[in-house]
Amino acid sequence: MTDSALSLLGLALRGGSLAVGEEPVREACKTRRAALVLTAADAAPGSADRARRWAQERGVPWVRLPWDKETLGGALGRSLCALAALTDRGLAAAVAAKLVRADEDLRPALVSLLNEKKNPRAKQKPAVPET
């Protein structure tokens, strides 16, 4: 399951829906584009704390991933990656679902995205009635 989550992160990067690195993640949170903030298992404590704080300030789910910086970076075509933020809500929900399937302990942190995945129309605007 987690390998497919890594694949989705690579797809998000290629599609321009993944902010990678401390400054891009901070900016994605600040501009309210971040849908899910991720930190590598071995991210520096200060970096992980900042990412968590940025996410919490904006009500964005945050999770520490089961992969180290090298594994996460390798999936993204980089040598290392400690912080990332998905900016596409659909991809964020898909990654959240895969992470929870692999580790049920992540469910509380990702419940808002999992609920969106179950009911994708809940966030859509209602149809305008014809007149």
Regions found by a protein language model. Name each.
Residues 23, 42-43, 67-70, 89:
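Short, ordered loop/turn segments at secondary-structure junctions
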Residues 8, 20, 97, 128-131:
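Long, amphipathic alpha-helical "stalk/connector" segments that mediate intersubunit docking
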Residues 34-36, 41-53, 60-61:
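N-terminal positively charged helical leader segments and presequences
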Residues 4, 46, 67, 90-94:
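Charged, alpha-helix-enriched surfaces in structured cytosolic catalytic cores
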Residues 73-115:
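C-terminal structural segments of small proteins and small subunits
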Residues 112-131:
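Charge-patterned, long linear interaction tracts outside catalytic cores
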Residues 4-39:
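N-terminal first-folded block
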Residues 57-83:
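Mid-chain, well-packed structural core segment of small domains
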